[in-house]
Amino acid sequence: MRSFLTRRDFLERASCAGALLAVTGPRLDAGQAGATAQGQMYLSLNGSVAKGVGWPDMARLAARVGFDGVDWSLGPAKTAGLDATKALFAELKIKPSITNLPMARPLPFQGEQSAFDQALVQLAEDAGFTAAIGCDRMMVVLSPTGPLPKDEWRKVVRDRVSAVAQVLQRSNIRLGLEFLGVQSFRAGRAGGPPPNPFIWTLPETVELAKDCGPNVGVILDVWHWHHSGGTTADILNTPKARIVHVHVSDAKAQPPEEVRDNQRLMPGEGVIDLSGFFQSLKKIGYQDGVSPEPLGRVPAEMSPEDGARLALDTTRAAMKKAGVVS
């Protein structure tokens, strides 16, 4: 027996309950996207549910399915050009929600200082492009371990992130730091030395963000919040301005040591308190993007469009259940 729903299962069950329109709302065509009521959180398409779709097809898919925004790709958009990218978003009437910080690993946290300084020069140009198309946020992932003891590594990360934030601030861009709460990310390799623990909870990430600048905040991923032992109180204690973007999925009940990052479920299929999560965000005034990111959940045989629609439908249903969207 299947342990989770296909999109057809989801729609049939909702329809049989006489609640399809109440749960998912009417299907939006490309020209109708961006229809979330003003002042509410809005849904943004993330590439994890539409694998193999490049740019600008990802934006067109988002609009066609009914997302109000898209997690967009800076490199391909720059290749297409500023005017073409602005025209694309104007045509589709969706938002360029967020993009990755355009620094190749091991930057920004590791790597030679000279390489970092050079990357900051390019970042200024990329930030200008990002702002010009109407996007005001970027994101980067924090490793929960570091090459140095925690206090020493925190100073390095703080200094690097602060420098990045200063460049982004000139273009009014916010930077989101995504913490990784799954235990396996903090485990050392078998037979190797134990890693140096770093930051992997919401409160500590918020404190780091505060030390890095007014335009630095958190990418709040419900999966990592749940697996880090996060609480709704943690969210309620976070200033709205420090939450840059939100990722959502769901999780099955299993021992922490067995959890792997690609075992996620669609919102509503698992045990995460999504209603408490969304209601807490609403209470602090969060009104920005929410991207479904159920890594490993979309079957290989499912088309990108069906994957995107399933993510949209299940996420919207969870948000309606929580009372945060109409």
Residue ranges and their predicted role:
Residues 1-18:
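N-terminal secretory signal peptides and thylakoid transit peptides that target proteins
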Residues 25-53, 60-64:
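C-terminal segment of N-terminal export signals and the immediately downstream linker at the start
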Residues 41-47, 70-72, 96-101, 138-140, ...:
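Hydrophobic faces of well-ordered beta-strands that scaffold small-molecule active sites
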Residues 48-54, 72-83, 106-109, 145-149, ...:
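Acidic-and-aromatic substrate-binding clefts and catalytic sites of carbohydrate-active enzymes
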Residues 50-62, 116-128, 228-235:
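Short, acidic/polar
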Residues 62, 70, 89, 130, ...:
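Conserved, mostly hydrophobic/aromatic
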Residues 68, 72-174, 224, 286-287, ...:
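Structural motif corresponding to the early beta-alpha repeats
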Residues 69, 163-271:
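Acidic/histidine-rich catalytic cores of soluble enzymes
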